[in-house]
A protein has these predicted regions:
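Membrane-interfacial loop-to-transmembrane alpha-helix junctions, especially the N-terminal start
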Residues: 39-49, 101-109, 169-172
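C-terminal transmembrane-bundle signature of multipass membrane proteins
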Residues: 148-151, 171-243
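Helix-loop junctions on the outward
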Residues: 55-78, 121-127
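Alpha-helical transmembrane segments in multipass membrane proteins, preferentially the mid-helix core
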Residues: 25-29, 90-91, 119, 141-163, ...
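Extracellular-loop-to-transmembrane junctions of the mid-late helices
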Residues: 125-151
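Hydrophobic transmembrane alpha-helical segments in integral membrane proteins
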Residues: 1-23
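Internal transmembrane alpha-helix with an interfacial aromatic "cap," most often the third helix
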Residues: 27-33, 78-125
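Hydrophobic alpha-helical transmembrane segments of multi-pass membrane proteins
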Residues: 22, 44-62, 181-189
């Protein structure tokens, strides 16, 4: 009972709990729908379920860590991201594969996402004095992913794959452009380098608590929303082909 009371009084831990339940519920939904999904889109929906399942497991441990220590579970969060974000990038390859997406595109997306996350972790945890440099490197990798999705190979292949894929790719692109933009903000607020050397907040601990809440909400929206777009695509594309 004490454990539950602490969770209800701790807004950060409470959002970790909500995140765990939301991610797990989404995973169950995606996995159960696999039998109702055509073979063409089954892998994409499976990956969506894996993304939310991996996140649910990590959120369970992040909540426990936060309750026990009161600290932000930065390490566990990056472990989650380094597993789930590349999988989110894989989705772009999977949905454009029928238009001729090459394996090289898959590796570009995965490599860029790993560079973005590893450099972010180094700047936020291992080399905080050099956080500006690491943040810039992470940002370059992020904008490279944005370029591929909005103007590069992904965008061109999506147009060739048909109107349903093109529409879904655009929605997913907005998740990357807008939804993922919250994470650099957390990096800026939580590192001594701030915004190119300008510390934006005086109470970093309070900022990190606030950003944990924002991260948790953003993670749920981004990961579950990403999967729902893929799921909707699997339904609308099949319906269009049967019409």
């Amino acid at each position: 009972m004490e454990h539950l009371r602490i969770a209800s009084d701790n807004y950060v831990a409470f959002t970790f709990f909500i995140g765990t339940m939301a991610m797990m519920a989404a995973s169950v939904f995606f996995f159960l729908e696999l039998n109702n999904t055509s073979k063409q889109w089954r892998t994409s929906v499976l990956v969506s379920g894996l993304i939310t399942f991996i996140a649910a497991v990590h959120y369970y441990y992040m909540r426990s860590y936060n309750l026990e220590t009161g600290d932000s579970p930065t390490f566990f969060r990056y472990v989650d991201w380094i597993l789930t974000v590349p999988l989110m990038c894989v989705e772009f390859y999977l949905i454009t594969k029928k238009a001729g997406a090459k394996i090289g595109l898959l590796w570009k997306l995965i490599f860029a996402s790993l560079v973005m996350l590893v450099t972010g972790y180094v700047g936020e945890v291992l080399d905080r004095d050099g956080s500006v440099l690491w943040g810039v490197l992470s940002g370059i990798a992020y904008f490279y992913i944005v370029y591929l999705i909005w103007f590069g190979e992904v965008s061109k292949l999506a147009q060739q794959a048909g109107p349903q894929v093109a529409k879904a790719t655009k929605v997913l692109g907005w998740f990357v452009l807008v939804g993922w933009a919250i994470y650099p903000l957390g990096y800026i607020l939580g590192t001594p380098g701030g915004l190119f050397g300008i510390q934006l907040v005086s109470d970093t601990a309070a900022a990190l608590n606030a950003m944990d809440i924002v991260y948790n909400i953003a993670d749920a929206i981004n990961k579950i929303g990403f999967g729902l777009v893929i799921y909707a695509l699997s339904r609308t594309d099949n319906a269009a082909e049967k019409a």
